[in-house]
Every structure is written in structure tokens, then in C-alpha cells.
Amino acid sequence: AAENVAIAARQSEPLLDMKQRTTHEDPNFMETFFRASRLHYIGTWKHRYEAFLEDLPPAPKLPAPRGGPGGERVILHVDMDCFFASVAALGRPELAGLPVAVSWSSAGGGELSSCNYLARATGCRAGMRIARAKEMCPNLIVMPYEFERYSAVAIDVYRLLHELSPHVMGVSVDEAYVDVTGLDGDPVQIAEDIRERIATKTGCAASVGVGPNRLIARLATKKAKPDAAYHVTATSAA
């Protein structure tokens, strides 16, 4: 049943037709090749995110650090866990509890773009060839790219982040920084609250690192993963 889900998803996306992707006899070869590529998606996502921002009011001035001059800022680094693979499983109960990866191809020479944690536990990693991944994980389900689904979930996530704070810096479709210095409350609880909102709204998990600046917040995310929050203060980072 899970394999049938992957086949149906691939067949529903004409850009992933193997003939279009591999033969120069198709006059639209170059167009379809780039439209089906991850790099093309990254570019189009940037334009979509910029359009999303245009509908928002200008962000006010950043609040002062907590505790006044010399105090710390509170920065969240929000990083969606195994984003492409997580979105692939949404609304597909057949994939629950199974190792899932994403690749433009289902053939052995294709390269994995994203793997869920069940797949990673077997040794599968992004950048690995499908043939090698299947040797390590014979029941691996390889889903196709589904760019519209990624964008829809990402916009939902960014809406939640902008509801939390107007000071959001988008990094990519699955990663952002949020300055929540002006919010009252424990920083870890703020992080846990936004994680819960994201999970409830999208069905996807996010890990959140908390720190006094973007660098430390990002390092904290490494401790938070998978699916948790972690706070590193300037003192503890020293």
C-alpha cells in the first residue's frame, strides 16, 4: 500500500515523468528539467515568500534586550524536522511508521533529498543514492518532490511565526529566526508553545533552538533535534 502511494504521487506530477527528464528529443526538455529541480523550487519559493511579506505591515523597531542595556536578546531558530519527508507523509496513513525519503527519481541512481528519522536510523542520509539506501533499508519508501505541498505548509508555518513576533527572518522554506525579546515568559516555554502551534496547524514537527543571537540559537537547535526545544544562554555558551 505504501509503495502504491509513492507511485500514485509520482504519476500525478507530470514534471517527474522520466522521459521529460532524460531525453533531449523533447522540445521542452530544459524547461521541464529545471521546473522539476530543487534549485528551481528554492528560487520560486523566495518569490512566494517575498509576496507573502508584502501583505504584512512593516515590522516595528526591535525591543531593547531583556534586562535593559547589556541584557540578552531572545532569538528562536525554528527548523522543521525532515521537512520534505514529513510533508510527504501528511494525509497518507499508509506511510505512518515507515522509513520515508524524498527524491526526484525512484531509480537507483537518484539521490535522496530528505529522509525521516526512521530512515536515518538505518543509515540513510540526504545525498545518498537510492540504490545504496535500499541496500541499507529495503522497505524505504521513496516519495517524489511535491513542491506545492511544501509551499503551502511553509506559508502556514510563517504565518504562525509572524503571529508570534513581527521580527521574523526567513532563511528557507523550512528554517527561520524569530526575535521574541519583547515577549514575556520563559524562553523555552515560548519555544515549546510555537512548536505546539506548528504541529497542530501543519502536522509537522519543528525543533527550536533558543539563544541570545542567531549563531547560538542555531547551535542550540542541534541539541534540540529531533522534535524538541533547547536554550543556550550567553553564559552557558562561553
Where are these regions (language model features)?
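Residues that scaffold, gate, or flank divalent-cation-dependent active/transport sites
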Residues: A2-V173, Y177, L183, I194, ...
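Long, highly charged, low-complexity intrinsically disordered interaction regions
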Residues: D186-A238
